[in-house]
Amino acid sequence: MKLSDFIAANNYTLIDFWASWCGPCRMEMPNVVAAYAKYKAKGFGIVGVSLDNDVESWKKAIKDLNITWPQMSDLKGWQCEGAALYGVRAIPATLLVSKDGTIVARDLRGEDLEAKLAELMK
């Protein structure tokens, strides 16, 4: 599947760039899990784009962090094509994208992510 397939399937999609070895990514993940649980029935989706190199570490982190949304990785680390396409130079990084592909917000975390979703999902 392509990123555009996930985006077209939801009213809003969070593209979450992360990696199993990224401490700040792991710390933020409970906020992302909570947002997904709260808003997925209202047309909110997430697709994770991992900057991992090791498939086992990546899969273990998905399980350990209770990540239930689709995940993608080319296992190329910082050479990830998706990261290059969206200009991601540090993680965690997020893009909130509308159904038509418009970037609505970048790098929302914690309360900022919740506030933006509450505004959009009225």
Predicted regions and their residues:
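Long, positively charged binding patches that form subdomain-scale interaction surfaces
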Residues: 1, 20, 56
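A short beta-strand-turn-helix
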Residues: 1-13
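Extracytoplasmic and endomembrane cell-envelope/extracellular-matrix remodeling and assembly machinery
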Residues: 9, 54, 113-115
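Short pre-active-site segment immediately N-terminal to redox-active cysteine/selenocysteine motifs
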Residues: 10-13, 18-21, 28, 90
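Short beta-strand segments
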Residues: 16, 47-50, 72
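Structural microenvironment flanking redox-active thiols in thiol-disulfide oxidoreductases
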Residues: 27-65, 77-84
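Thiol/disulfide oxidoreductase modules built on the thioredoxin-like
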Residues: 65-67, 74-121
